[in-house]
């Protein structure tokens, strides 16, 4: 069976590839390499909103273009290929979850601002002592009239230092089983009692934080969905997040960088260079087909748990292997005293370190494999 984009999708892909290639200046790229959520990043997101591109995958009723999931994947892939950081948590996970579970008041307030690129969310799930066992969270929210009083701590909150709001998982019924009694609150980061400290990751960038909640008063109308039934929202949001963690464009961008360098240095006939580039191109194609498969299924039903996890596992593990292999190629054949080679080697080093997070961001791959086995293959859950 031959699978390919139709004519209109190919035209969209070409338009987006051109758009993202010229979206950022060299200085803006250099800044966002280290400061992933700073003022330059926010300006770029506003630029995308002003140009009307943030709504590619959103329904028209919420201000979007009304395109389907395949077009949304094209948008994400082309941004990844150009190494343009999207407001992915806000645009691709919180936004769609609000569309399904939010109140009319929440939708009318948050969704237009997201599409304009003016409002940013961070996800407050992980906690210091609970590892990947999200359901064991201990951040609590106690009802006090028209407010919830929130106390606790989260860790590895991506963009927490620059977010306008935190999509926060809290325990609202401490006596319920651990997967129950959880709720989702939207916390305004300007509220008294909210604070953060930076976590600098191995790529040298500041894009995650520890966030703290000390008697933060959250209005009750910032409860998303039904109180004590937040686990459903968490799984919906995480399924969207896992899909976005495996775009084929990330591999395509890697190929473009190294191929251009190898061609300029007359290395395309070197056996190890050709082998590495062929593997990279083939992996991009497989990843792209997997993206399309998930997108096609999503057109008629919610994101499948097993499909979302499979996309995340494949994309995150293959990209790490490819970066390792291509770093060896550049190191073997390149001269770091040459500016072009030094620039490529530095870029590969930063990206390789940054991609390490992909195997546990959005849920560690060991758990993703169990989700694939149980939900996709009907196998029994591993005893605990």
Which residues are covered by each model-predicted region?
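Glycine-rich beta->alpha junctions and the first turn(s) of the following alpha-helix
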Residues: 2-7, 11, 194-288, 358
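A short, Trp-centered hydrophobic/proline-enriched beta-strand micro-motif
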Residues: 117-125, 169
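Glycine-rich phosphate/pyrophosphate-binding beta-alpha loops
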Residues: 155-160, 202-203, 357-362
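Internal helix-loop-helix
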Residues: 49-117, 159-165, 284, 291, ...
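Short, charged, amphipathic alpha-helical segments
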Residues: 274-279, 305-313
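A short core secondary-structure module
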Residues: 147, 151-197
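Glycine-rich phosphate/cofactor-binding loops in nucleotide/flavin-utilizing enzymes
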Residues: 2, 70, 74-75, 93, ...
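A structural signal for short hydrophobic beta-strand segments in well-ordered beta-sheet cores
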Residues: 139-142
């Amino acid at each position: 069976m031959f699978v390919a984009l139709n004519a209109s999708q190919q035209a969209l892909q070409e338009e987006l590839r051109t758009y993202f290639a010229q979206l950022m200046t060299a200085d803006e790229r250099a800044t966002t390499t280290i400061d992933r959520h700073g003022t330059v990043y926010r300006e770029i997101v506003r630029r995308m909103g002003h140009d009307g591109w943030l709504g590619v995958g959103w329904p028209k009723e919420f201000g979007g273009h009304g395109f389907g999931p395949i077009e949304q994947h094209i948008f994400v892939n082309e941004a990844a290929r150009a190494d343009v950081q999207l407001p992915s948590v806000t645009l691709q996970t919180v936004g769609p979850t609000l569309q399904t579970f939010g109140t009319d008041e929440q939708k009318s307030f948050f969704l237009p601002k997201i599409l304009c690129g003016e409002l940013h969310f961070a996800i407050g799930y992980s906690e210091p002592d609970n590892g990947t066992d999200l359901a064991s969270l201990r951040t609590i929210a106690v009802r006090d009239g028209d407010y919830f009083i929130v106390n606790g701590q989260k860790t590895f909150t991506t963009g927490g230092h620059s977010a306008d709001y935190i999509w926060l998982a809290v325990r609202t019924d401490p006596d319920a089983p651990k997967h129950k009694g959880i709720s989702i609150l939207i916390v305004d980061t300007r509220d008294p009692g909210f604070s953060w400290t930076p976590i600098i990751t191995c790529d040298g960038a500041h894009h995650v934080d520890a966030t703290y909640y000390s008697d933060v008063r959250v209005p009750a109308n910032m409860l998303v969905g039904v109180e004590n039934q937040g686990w459903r929202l968490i799984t919906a949001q995480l399924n969207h997040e896992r899909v976005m963690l495996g775009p084929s464009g990330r591999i395509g961008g890697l190929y473009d960088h190294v191929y251009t360098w190898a061609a300029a240095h007359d290395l395309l006939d070197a056996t190890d260079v050709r082998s590495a580039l062929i593997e990279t191109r083939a992996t991009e194609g497989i990843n792209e087909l997997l993206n399309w498969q998930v997108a096609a299924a999503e057109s008629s039903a919610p994101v499948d748990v097993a499909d979302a996890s499979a996309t995340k596992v494949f994309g995150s593990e293959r990209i790490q292997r490819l970066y390792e292999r291509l770093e060896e190629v550049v190191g073997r054949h390149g001269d770091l005293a040459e500016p072009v080679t030094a620039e490529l080697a530095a870029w590969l080093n930063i990206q390789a370190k940054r991609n390490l997070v992909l195997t546990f961001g959005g849920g560690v791959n060991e758990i993703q494999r169990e989700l694939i086995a149980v939900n996709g293959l009907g196998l029994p859950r591993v005893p605990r």
